[in-house]
């Protein structure tokens, strides 16, 4: 019998509990993320693309750690790319609209810092079902991580109510997390 999948809330509680002590963990946890239309994350040409799993590229797992410098009740997290020194951040575009940017940054350095790093932070908010959540920008609170309805398009930011998809499945796929000795 296959073990029952954890809810997003359970996954996040485990994450925040494990990373309570900033010196306890030596690497982020890996999560599989896919939108409610079954599009998974792929890193291609320096962009994070949402596409069906049968895509020709390898699925990009997301490195995740909590941001303990913001209000923990809102479940702030940093999202990076597993096995890469790249992290998602929200910045203003030349049109003064928030945009999603992937920057070179060590997610564990952000985690260990005492700075808030709101531009790098997303609030993981249960929406939809117990198995889905949305990721709200901490720097731009009305903006959410999103995918296009069309496959093979880059992830971005949008406001709630837009025609884009803001609900994601979020599943920890890390092997036993390592504690520093």
Where are these regions (language model features)?
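Lectin-like carbohydrate-binding module/patch detector with strong preference for beta-trefoil
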Residues: 1-181
